[in-house]
């Protein structure tokens, strides 16, 4: 939805927040357009991947894991009906989103550096660094469409360095991200690419791959997450 739809609340749609900063991807409300529906699902994944790569307690609304919309109503306090109820039957229709949520939660749990400050990385990389298209170029402005954030620190067991690279392309065309160089003996591994099509029955983890190039093509409106692992 581009705007709130609180008409059924009885206040002529004057109640509720007007600053939702939302985008309907090309159609208001439900649609049978596969391109719009596909883009919406990708944007949901982008938002959740960003949340799971953010410090502090990660909070989201119940029902986000199966694309609950409340039919655009953002103030459903007076709606004791299907507007505010959680329809768990949507889990089957949005299995793709539910699987992605589970995977991202597990990824966050497995990489403590995404959740909190840990001991400094033995490789001397900074805890958090910003890479605006080029390694160590931290400048951003309102026209920026591509951003990379690298997290580095010791893992929770103080056995190895935990290095994660988050990248978002908010533009409608593919952009190039130059990847920062890793310590000797380590290689980037792509573990999240929200642009990839969902294949029912195939684990998200099975779509991961090692990445040996110095630059990364980031598809339109896509989040990619890479993790540093030992060369194989």
Show which residues each predicted segment covers:
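Alpha-amylase-like alpha-glycosidases and glucanotransferases acting on alpha-linked glucans and related
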Residues: 1-36
